[in-house]
Amino acid sequence: MKEKLHPAYQKARIVCVCGAQFEVGSTKKEMRVDICSKCHPFYTGMQRTVETRGRADKFRRKYGLGK
């Protein structure tokens, strides 16, 4: 590696809009994010599942298609 070519790698603080803060390594000192693992529905278990069977049946009825 060449000297003085690469940016300085330091500890960075990640701040989420929900208030959670994390420390990671980065070339920036601070970053702000809209969503993190503390507030994302997938990680919190509050996710919703979409019922696709009803949509498929509606499509088949609309266009007269059989299963």
Curated annotation (Swiss-Prot):
Binds the 23S rRNA. It comes from Desulforudis audaxviator (strain MP104C). Part of the 50S ribosomal subunit. One of its GO terms (cellular component) is ribonucleoprotein complex. GO terms for molecular function: metal ion binding; rRNA binding; structural constituent of ribosome. SUPFAM superfamilies: L28p-like (SSF143800). Zn(2+) binds at residues 16, 18, 36, 39. InterPro entries: Ribosomal_bL28/bL31-like_sf, Ribosomal_bL31, Ribosomal_bL31_A, Ribosomal_bL31_sf. Coiled coil: none annotated. Binds 1 zinc ion per subunit. Keywords: Metal-binding, Ribonucleoprotein, Ribosomal protein, RNA-binding, rRNA-binding, Zinc. This is Large ribosomal subunit protein bL31. GO terms for biological process: translation. Its cofactor is Zn(2+). Belongs to the bacterial ribosomal protein bL31 family. Type A subfamily. It comes from the Bacteria.
